[in-house]
């Protein structure tokens, strides 16, 4: 299943996990894979001693800082980064969501590959579908040449879907197929293609609330 990272503002991430409805904006809590604390602490120490160019990318400077809260947050991103699985990041407005996704990418084994961000809040359903999955030549009137899919451009790298709760049900269900089987088809094509890209999604609405409001498919949480 998806690993979920929740961003909150406060300091401590110790103690039992809270429900999404109990959470304040900004602190980092990790749900999902096992926590390899000693290994993570070692990785954090290595990162702190590395030159900035070794791990920084555009936007990731917002996660630079020596505070205990920020160090704890980065270490939890490292915990997620070492598990090469789909990841959902949630936080309120003002939290560094896209920089967190970029940090996740450069902290993973995919750091040398492409990071392809898509803003799901922009454009109509058809435009978003074309940006994510691309289209073949003659897929529709005026499609005189094929357009590559973001998922193809992110091959072996990371595809970021920002504001996924704004994507239509049609788009989200195609993403379910992608996450479940690694399969996808460009618009206008019946040929199945396969992807090895890691998908990272950002939600600005609490996941459970988004599911209950019909804005986020529960099936995506299961992939």
Kindly give the residue locations of the regions a language model identified.
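Short beta-strand-to-loop transition segments that serve as allosteric relay/switch motifs
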Residues: 6-12, 204-205
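Conserved ASCE P-loop NTPase core motifs with emphasis on AAA+ ATPases
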Residues: 9-64, 68, 75, 223
């Amino acid at each position: 299943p998806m690993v979920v990272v929740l961003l909150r503002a406060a300091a401590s991430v110790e103690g039992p996990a809270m429900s999404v409805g109990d959470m304040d904006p900004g602190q980092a809590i990790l749900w999902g894979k096992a926590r390899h604390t000693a290994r993570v602490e070692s990785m954090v120490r290595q990162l702190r001693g590395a030159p900035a160019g070794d791990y920084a990318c555009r936007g990731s400077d917002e996660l630079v800082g020596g505070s205990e809260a920020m160090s704890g947050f980065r270490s939890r991103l490292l915990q997620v980064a070492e598990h090469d699985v789909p990841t959902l990041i949630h936080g309120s407005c003002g939290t560094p969501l896209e920089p967190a996704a970029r940090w996740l990418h450069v902290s993973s084994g995919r750091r040398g590959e492409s990071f392809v961000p898509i803003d799901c809040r922009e454009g109509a359903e058809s435009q978003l579908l074309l940006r994510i999955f691309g289209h073949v030549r003659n897929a529709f009137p005026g499609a005189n040449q094929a357009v590559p899919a973001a998922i193809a451009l992110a091959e072996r790298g990371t595809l970021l879907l920002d504001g996924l709760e704004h994507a239509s049900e049609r788009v989200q269900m195609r993403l379910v197929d992608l996450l479940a089987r690694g399969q996808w088809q460009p618009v206008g094509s019946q040929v199945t293609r396969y992807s090895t890209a890691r998908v990272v999604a950002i939600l600005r609405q609490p996941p459970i609330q988004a599911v209950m409001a019909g804005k986020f498919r529960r099936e995506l949480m299961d992939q």
